Structure formats: C-alpha cells, structure tokens
UniProtKB/Swiss-Prot annotation:
Xref: Pfam families: Acyltransferase, GPAT_C
GO MF, one annotated term: glycerol-3-phosphate O-acyltransferase activity
Principal EC category: transferase
Native source species: Serratia proteamaculans (strain 568)
Protein name listed in UniProt: Glycerol-3-phosphate acyltransferase
Residue ranges of coiled coil: none
Domain notes: The HXXXXD motif is essential for acyltransferase activity and may constitute the binding site for the phosphate moiety of the glycerol-3-phosphate.
Principal cellular location given in the protein's record: membrane
Keywords on record: Acyltransferase, Cell inner membrane, Cell membrane, Lipid biosynthesis, Lipid metabolism, Membrane, Phospholipid biosynthesis, Phospholipid metabolism, Transferase
A GO cellular-component term linked to this record: plasma membrane
Domain of life where this protein originates: Bacteria
Length: 821
C-alpha cells in the first residue's frame, strides 16, 4: 500500500474511531466459524465503502485476524486481500457484479490451479450501519447503496448501532477442484455472494413495514373477516358499519406498531440495564437461527416463560445476533400505560386469555397472525401461555400453535420453522410473588405502580441464559406425520381438518421436550439443588463442593442432551459466585464454613432447583432405589424405574421413551460406579457406605416427586372408582397436609397442574380404564414399590388418611393393623 493511501486511510479512520462502536457477529468468529488466521483470507464485502472497510479492519485486528488492507503475496503474485462485489452509489451497476471482483476471483482461482497446496479462505463480511426496514412503497432495496453524503450521515447517526457480520468461509481450493477455475465460475461466485448479502440484510432488517391503516384495510378486505363482520352484525342485531367498527377496534387492540427508532432507543436502555443488573447474558446456538433466517425461513420463536423480562431479553439477544426482533404475542394484561404502547412499538401484539364466545375476535386475531407470516415477519409466542410459577415447564397451551398451522393452510407463506428456546436466570424478579400465588394469594394485576416496585428491587441478578434448541421445520414435520396435509390448503376459509388437534398436541409436546433439551445448569440452580436436598437446608463448604462436583461430573460425562449447557467453572468458583448473589448465609466456626439456606429463602430456591430437575431425575431415582434396598439387581432397578418413568416423562417433558431406558440407564450407572457412589457386584448394584452422604443428597432430588405419586396411587388403590376431579382434589389436599406435617417446602408439591398431568398420564398408561375405574392390581404394584422408597413417617401419614375408605382395598400393612384391632 502506497504512502499516500496509508495517510488517506489514517485520516479517514480518525472520525470512525470516535463515531463507530460496532458489534461483532458472532462474538468469537475465529472459534465459532473455524477460521484459521495462519491461512490466507480473502475478505468479501457487498459494495465499495471505505467506511465499511475500515470498520472491518478495526474488528479484524481486535480478533487477531489478518489486516484486510495488507495485500496477499502468493507465488510472486500480489493481490488485494479484500474485494467489493459492487461499486458504490452507481445504481445502474447494482444488479451486475463489477468486473474488478470477477477478475479478482478469477485470479485467485487461477492461483489454485497452479498451486495444489494453496487453500484460500473466502470470508464474506457485511458491515451495517442501522437497520431500519423502511416503509412499504418507498422502494428501498435490501442491499441499498449509499453515496458519500448518505454514508457520512449514516456513520454519524448510526455509528453506535452498527455491526460486522462474519459468515462461514468458502474454500477456494474446493471451488477450484469441484467446479474449475475459468471466468464463468468466478462470475457465479460473485453472483452467489451478492445473493448471500441480500438475504443476510433481509434477515437483519426484516421486510418493509406497512402503514398501520393500510394493514387494517387489507385485513378488513379478507373474506374471513368480511364473513365474521356479517355474522357479528346479524347475531348482535347491529348495523354492518358498527360491526366493522368493532373489527377495527379489535385490530387496534391486537396489532403491533413496530418502530425501528424505539427498538434502537430501547437497545441503549437495555444495554445499560443488563450491564448494571446482570453479570452476563450467555447465548448458545444462535448460529442455527441466523442460518435459518438467511435461508429464507419464516421463524417462530417458542421460548419457555419465566418472567416478564423474557419479552425484552429475547428481543435484545436477537437484535445483537444481527437478526430483526420478532413480533411478540403478549398477554393483554401488559397493555397498560406506559408499558403497553412501548411494548407495541417494540413489536408486541396483544392476545386475550381466551377466545371463547367471540368469533369476531378469534377471526381477526387469526387473520392478523396469518398476515404476519405472509409478510415474512418473525413471530414469538410463549407456548406455555403464562409464566411458570414453579420453575418447571407448564402444560402447553395450543391455541396460537394451532393458528400457526392454519396459517400454513392458507398457502403462499415461506417455510415456517419453530425454534424452541430455553430462557434461564439466576434470579427471577417475580419469584417472591410466584410463591405467594402458589400459597393462594390473588394474582396482582399488572400496573405502572407494580412495575416501578419491581424495578426498585432489581439488583445483582447474576447470569442470564438464552439457549436456542433444535429447530422444528413444520413442512418436514407435516410431510412425515400428515402426508395429506396439503389437501386442506384453503386461502379463504380457516381450516380445521380432523388431523389438526392431535398434530398440534404432538407438536406442542415436542417443543416442550426440545426446550428442556436446551436447559442451562448454573451456579444458582446447582447450589439450590444441593442445599434443598439436605433436610436441615445446610451443608459444610466441603460437603457442598463435593455435591456440586457430583452433579457436574454426571452432567459432563453423561450429557442429558446435546444442547444442555453445563458450567465450565470449578465447584469452588460456582459456589463463590452463588454466595455473591446473597441468597445463602455462611456461618463460620473453628472447623470451617457452613452454608445455610435460610427458611424464608428455601421456598424461593425451589424455583431454581426445578429449572434443572429433569437433568438429574434419573440419577436421583437410581440413587434412591439403591439407597433404600442397599443391594438391588440391575434388572429390578430397570423394572422399578420403568413403572414410574411414564409419569416422570409426562411431568418433566423428558426426551427418551420408556423403551430406551436400558440404553439411557447404563451410562448413568457406570458414571455413578466411577464416582464410587455405588459399587458394581456383577448383576447387582450395592450401596457404598463411604459415599453415603453424596448418594443421599442425590437421592433427595426425587424424594418429593415419589411422595406425590405415592399419594395418588394410595387414594386410587383405596377407592378405584373415584372420579378424576375428586382424585386430583384429594391428592392436592393430602399433599398440602403432608407439606405442613413434614415441612415440605416445595410449592409445586401440591400444585393443581402437576396432579392433573399425573392423573392424565395414569389414564393414558392404563392404570385407569375406559369407564374411569382404577385397575387396582396395577396401582397397587406401583404403590407397593413407592412405599419402599419413601420414609416410614410419610408412608404412615399417607395411609392414615387414604386407606380407611374401603377395607378390602387396603394394602397389607394397614389391613394387618385393622385385623389386630
């Protein structure tokens, strides 16, 4: 590079250093994209811009990548290490790759022909200043060109809202070997690069925004809403104009009013907020979503729902991953001033809790959702319907998912892909409120005052986690499970084919399983699990560290699922981090530290334990069975786990089927033997007295679950003809009684939804027959097994309440007592 050019770039770089603070996507391109800085890199940019080139250079130097301003010298040939696919603001050359780029590609390909050891990495990079999608009708292309003046103002105004996006490399060696090195291949390479950048920009910016009134007019003109308006006028005996006004009012209530400027402002506020409140936001598998967006998929984000913070956190994360924030289905309870208007401009559209009895509302909402898909907007909704009060996944609500399938049946939309997302926190700001609600307190209505009270309490929230799970492409799913689904496509009428409900239910279950498959273990949920396992809610520092090591080794050596994230820190580091969260107390004496979970915190900490309960439930069950029997054969262990596994699978959305248990249990048992928690005696597994403490703590993780199952099986065995509603109610009442008598500090222990799921599973598994009666020999088999795994005190309390209902239905223990009397 000549001296004058160096001076020119240095002068140009001065204002850029002051004005530009770009983000890198992905955050660690060398590792995430598998770049090799020791091999030559050819940087490919979409169009000629010195500001883009210097912004790229700054990030390359920060990432220890080769300087794009330094030319490459290969076999005596000197070539620039960057190339622009298009010239600058000359619009007439926009659609044709400029000759210089084609020539440079050809020169590089030609070098590979003469040098078989050469392999240059072609690295596409896009630099974006601002992400305004523009308004419909303005004709702004997705790969727009800015002249010098426009670029100056873009850098001045949007320099801190810019990002440098590195894409996967293309091996020029592979291109030369597979496709040749002539000029036609170079032209194709330039054309493919142009298409790549155009798609990438669309994924980052999204489609142009419609004028709100134009959108409403289009919806009103749809056949479905026209018919619903006519039905509204006829059923309510009002004029057609009045019915149409009702429809418009519903659109005003529902529809988002997306504003890029609001998103940009909120990004600054949220960046300050996250940095102040959280010690880090950990994002995993975002590249999956970036690739889906770039491949043209219509993305539906389906996260679990822990907190009102979820709405903001996920949009913030997606924005920082170079993706357009989605339109979010938010509960109508959040449509209060000032939150409602702000959320609406951030992309929220509002949904009522129920559609029943309001055909006009359901039609307007369904058509609006379908219009979002047709226009190509990404959408987000919480498949659980509401925030989990217990820390576990809730039974899915399938209404919006059903409408998503119906949107596909309108035809014409891009391929829709569901992306499950696990959101986790080390501190959920509403957790205290959740505990009160589970104890029976009335849910407080959302308001400005409540929001301000919540914000006042926010501090030291630890880490946040956003893990993108395994995507579920709807077209592929329907092709496999409902081959005839295209026969139901109707662009006018909303379809409800016979296969819709079972298909939606199966899809919902798969989504929940994939959310759990992407869970995040962290310092808070691991420490909470260990301390809650101790009956006194306290452990010495050494005992707690030993237990953390046990959990970590199980999760690392026998991963629950490929997408689960496990901390890389040592137990000491995790404990120190958890103690800094000020949830636990430390008592010091001459012997050492004792870590205590205060009584008032115990109920709240069950929330975090429940986030990862499914990850440890099978090791806990193995530990329980070995500990109570002291010696058990592998076959008997498998039989006992097999009896209750369907209930665990339904309750915790476990991903393995019962038939897979032998393959699932084998590595877990081997790991527990390796940790010397149990001993291998041929076909038998034996308790190891030297490691009884960690085994007891591991076993305690499933203690309350087994007690709940024992309650229901006991009632069902004593009264086989009890109806479903009464069974759920009596189980809940007895669980509350046990909670009081035995100090069980887990709100979900008597949660209505948990017992409802259990009873539904018992029916599905044949414990309750078609006429609603229990098959007593089956329920007794399970109860007798469970009664060996719970403490005598708990067993006595259960049997003293449930068993007198019918003498001939009593277990042997109680029947014997009555005979003696």
């Amino acid at each position: 590079m000549s001296g004058w050019r160096k001076i020119y770039y240095k002068l140009l770089n001065l204002p850029l250093k002051l004005l530009v603070r770009s983000k890198v996507i992905p955050s660690d391109p060398v590792t995430e994209l598998g770049l090799d800085p020791s091999r030559p890199i050819l940087y490919v940019l979409p169009y000629n811009s010195k500001a883009d080139l210097l912004t790229l250079r700054t990030q390359c130097l920060a990432q220890d990548l080769p300087d794009p301003l330094n030319p490459l010298e290969i076999d005596g040939t000197v070539l620039p290490s960057h190339v622009f696919i298009h010239d600058g603001p000359r619009v007439f050359r926009y659609y044709t790759p400029k000759e210089e780029s084609v020539k440079l590609f050809h020169d590089y390909l030609d070098l590979h022909r003469s040098n078989p050891d050469l392999d240059i990495q072609m690295l596409p990079v896009s630099v974006m200043f601002g992400r305004s999608p523009g308004r419909e009708g303005h004709g702004t292309p997705h790969l727009r060109l800015l002249n010098g003046v426009q670029k100056f103002f873009a850098v001045l105004w949007l320099g801190r809202d810019s990002f440098v996006r590195f894409s996967n490399t293309v091996s020029l060696r592979r291109m030369a070997t597979e496709h040749g090195t002539d000029k036609i291949i170079a032209q194709k390479l330039a054309r493919v690069a142009r298409m790549h950048f155009s798609r990438q920009r669309l994924a980052a910016v999204g489609p142009s925004l419609p004028a709100r009134q134009d959108l409403f007019n289009k919806l009103l003109a749809s056949k479905a809403i026209e018919k619903a308006v006519e039905d509204e006028a006829r059923s309510k005996k009002i004029s057609h104009e009045k019915a149409q006004q009702n429809a418009i009012a519903l659109m005003e209530e529902i529809a988002a009013d997306f504003s890029y400027e609001t998103v940009r402002l909120s990004d600054r506020v949220l960046s300050w907020t996250w940095n102040r409140l959280y010690q880090g936001i950990n994002v995993t598998n975002a590249e999956r979503v970036r690739q889906l967006a770039q491949d043209g998929h219509e993305i539906v984000y389906v996260p679990c729902h822990r907190s009102h913070m979820d709405y903001l956190l996920l949009s913030y994360v997606l924005y920082h991953q170079g993706l357009v924030p989605p339109h979010i289905a938010a509960g109508i309870n959040l449509n209060f001033w000032p939150a409602g208007p702000i959320f609406r401009r951030l992309g929220a559209f509002f949904i009522r809790r129920t559609f029943k009895g309001n055909k006009l509302y359901s039609t307007v909402f369904r058509e609006y959702l379908g219009e979002l898909f047709t226009r190509g907007y990404s959408v987000e909704y919480f498949v659980e319907g509401g925030r989990s009060r217990t820390g576990r996944l809730l039974e899915p609500k399938t209404g919006t998912l059903s409408m998503t399938i119906q949107a596909m049946l309108r035809g014409g939309s891009r391929p829709i892909t569901l992306v499950p997302i696990y959101i986790g926190y080390e501190h959920v700001m509403e957790v205290g409120t959740y505990a009160k609600e589970l104890r029976g307190a009335t849910k407080e209505k959302e308001s400005l005052l409540q929001m301000l009270r919540g914000l006042r309490k926010l501090r030291n929230l630890g880490q946040g986690y956003v893990n993108f799970g395994d995507p579920l492409p709807l077209t592929a799913y329907l092709n496999q499970n409902v081959p005839q689904w295209r026969e139901s496509i109707d662009p006018i009428e909303a379809q409800r084919p016979s296969w819709l409900t079972p298909t939606v239910n199966d899809l919902a279950a798969k989504i929940m399983v994939r959310i759990n498959n992407a869970a995040a273990a962290n310092a808070m949920n691991l420490c909470s699990t260990a301390l809650l396992a101790s009956r006194q809610r306290s452990l010495t520092r050494e005992q707690l560290l030993e237990q953390l090591e046990c959990y970590l080794q199980l999760m690392r050596n026998v991963p629950y699922a490929g997408d689960v994230t496990v901390p890389t820190q040592t137990p000491d580091e995790l404990l120190d981090h958890a103690l800094n969260m000020n949830k636990f107390e430390v008592e010091k004496d001459n012997i050492g530290d004792i870590i205590i979970l205060p009584r008032e915190q115990a109920v709240l900490m069950t929330y975090y334990r429940n986030n990862i309960h499914h990850l440890l439930v099978l090791p806990s069950l193995i530990a329980t069975i070995v500990m109570h029997h002291r010696r058990v054969s592998r076959a008997e262990l498998l039989r006992q786990i097999g009896l209750i596994y369907p209930m665990l699978k339904a309750e915790l959305f476990l991903h393995n089927d019962k038939e897979q248990l032998p393959e699932v249990l084998r590595p877990l048992i081997d790991e527990m033997i390796r940790q010397q928690l149990i001993c291998d005696k041929g076909d038998d597994l034996v308790l190891n007295p030297a490691r009884i403490r960690p085994l007891q703590l591991l076993a305690a993780g499933v203690r309350e679950t087994l007690q709940r199952y024992a309650i229901t099986m006991s009632i069902l065995s004593a009264n086989p003809s009890i109806n479903r509603g009464a069974l759920e109610k009596e189980s809940r009442i007895m669980a509350q009684r046990l909670s009081v008598l035995h100090g069980i500090n887990a709100p979900e222990f008597f949660d209505k939804a948990v017992f409802s799921t259990l009873v539904a599973t018992l029916r599905a598994e044949g414990y309750i027959n078609d006429i609603g009666d229990a098959v007593r020999e089956h329920t007794m088999e399970v109860y007798n097994m469970l009664s060996d795994l719970i403490t005598p005190e708990i067993k006595l309390t259960i049997e003293s309440v449930s068993m007198p209902a019918e003498t001939n239905a009593l277990p042997e223990t109680v029947a014997a007592e009555e005979k003696e009397d």
